[in-house]
């Protein structure tokens, strides 16, 4: 069947934006304080997230009211009925999932956090007629890792002790019995949760509920990293710290192996399915998706170890035969795991079935239709812009709703594209700078349109094919009123042109009561990691950056610069950092600082840089350049040597240590001259309980600096006992920002040739 690749742009009327195309500056006189921005945010917009449900009427959803009760509401009529009264909600309820026919509720209680996404809990099933509760497992003790209704509601798959179980009204069946510290069934291990799946589950029901696909991870041979907890949530420290033994593969170390399993629920038969796309020791499974309306085909997106080759392997469930239906070579950089595969079915008059996915095979991330049986894909979108998310697939109307950077890489506008006509239609006025998102009802007839900035966010309800809102869901009127009392920093956006001709997105925040006749210190606030984005026209929280631009004793300008390697500007822009992390990113931040220093309102002698995580690493690489462009560096929870970080993230960008030894050496922070010469010194902050970027990074860096003779005048170090990567344990977060405020104040007041202790004037042998 022949398809035209001509992509039409629809001319239908789009929704107007009842907000200003820039961030608010307030209309009052009050300045934001530290307590209002860091300790407890005084002004913060809210938004609702609804769980759409399938009933006889489109537009119904379930939500938990402020009193704790569960209610069903028609978003169209606003009629509400109570599903579970507040006094019948289980004590200590953490989350809930509704049975497909609304007859029961699955509750999670007794929550205990594990890693970024995962947690342990008890689970209860509540009948909404009788309100009776029964435990999912009679002997549960806050140890269930995950639970999920089947699409038909006649079963619950859950994971306990790293084993998969299936509950039905009649009984509970244990599907696997080899789960343990090194074997994970149906849930990811640490590295798959953190770097690949980005979630706490690794099991998927078929659309008809007849089969369950799940992944099995084997950590045998994966090296262990020990994280000590000195206080361990006690008021008085125990004599010996608790030690977390975490299987954490670092660069070129053994990775967990992964295996696909299929379970037929009717018979209880479980079958391992070999995925031979790559050698078992090299194989990474990034995504599992059912490409069928029933249970005929399940597909896995497989990557090689360094994630620059990809194969989509389809499994015929009846025969268990496998077939590679799509393959990519991304050895010019890396291939992102976007978790966006979804079944479409036949299109047009053809009986051939398709699935949709986001791919940057054209050099820009776009929507493509791929044949389930394999073959040439069809481009649904194209151009020098990128699709950032698929929001909804409306099969009856043959439409895909998506977000993209079509207007600018710092913006997100909402569009639909028809796979029948190939016509792209904006749902909002995409000529107005903004960031949008949307949530579509179960039958696709309505959607909540969320405006996310740069002005104060709001949410309206729309019917499809209408540009008039049915009603406002969230107005954030209190925020609008609150801003009338304050005067806020002024946020602007612009681009810097590199000598290469490429451009960098910049977000500038000017202090309250800014005067072009004064000179202000500047704080750069980069993240800068591969594929990331900080410069966005979304609402900018009134946080620490707003505070330092408001406090009359600080009055810092802030610059946030998205360097080369960051996201949403095409594959070539992001992939040029491959195998040499830290080089181009640091060069771009230095270039931006040099441009800032030329501005008449910038105090060129006081330009600081502060970053967290990858931003902390980038800050170190900037200081290492010894450029003189920056006068102070603050590194929070930084990587200092990529050999210390996990394999699946690091090797995606740096490849293996064996193949790129020179690149790893160059990317590590080891040159000390910049640390000795930076005029205002460096502050390094890190949590000792960081299970992501280990404290080892800061410890090794500090030892390198001290051993090379960096003086106490130039180096300050702060650890946070038992804090993880977010640094919040026992008030660590507030302390961190107070310390940062103090250093910025000292830097602003620092004289270029001040008095110093005699130790700093001579070498110490």
Curated annotation (Swiss-Prot):
One GO MF term: aminopeptidase activity
Statement: the UniProt record of this protein carries the keyword Secreted: yes
Protein's name in the database: Probable dipeptidyl peptidase 4
Homology family: Belongs to the peptidase S9B family.
PANTHER family per the UniProt record, alphabetical: DIPEPTIDYL PEPTIDASE 4-RELATED, PROTEASE FAMILY S9B,C DIPEPTIDYL-PEPTIDASE IV-RELATED
Compartment(s) where it occurs, according to its Swiss-Prot or TrEMBL record: Secreted
UniProt keywords, alphabetically: Aminopeptidase, Glycoprotein, Hydrolase, Protease, Secreted, Serine protease, Signal
Glycan attachment residues as annotated in the record: 35, 78, 101, 110, 169, 218, 465, 490, 665
Pfam families, sorted: DPPIV_N, Peptidase_S9
Job description of the protein: Extracellular dipeptidyl-peptidase which removes N-terminal dipeptides sequentially from polypeptides having unsubstituted N-termini provided that the penultimate residue is proline.
One Gene Ontology term from the biological process aspect of the record: proteolysis
Signal peptide: 1-14
Top-level lineage group: Eukaryota
Cellular component aspect of the GO annotation: extracellular region; plasma membrane
EC number: 3.4.14.5
Gene3D superfamilies registered for this protein in UniProt: alpha/beta hydrolase, Dipeptidylpeptidase IV, N-terminal domain
Native source organism of the sequence: Neosartorya fischeri (strain ATCC 1020 / DSM 3700 / CBS 544.65 / FGSC A1164 / JCM 1740 / NRRL 181 / WB 181)
Organism lineage string: Eukaryota, Fungi, Dikarya, Ascomycota, Pezizomycotina
Residues annotated as the enzyme's active site: 613 (charge relay system), 690 (charge relay system), 725 (charge relay system)
Catalyses which reaction(s): Release of an N-terminal dipeptide, Xaa-Yaa-|-Zaa-, from a polypeptide, preferentially when Yaa is Pro, provided Zaa is neither Pro nor hydroxyproline
Principal cellular location given in the protein's record: secreted
Top EC category: hydrolase
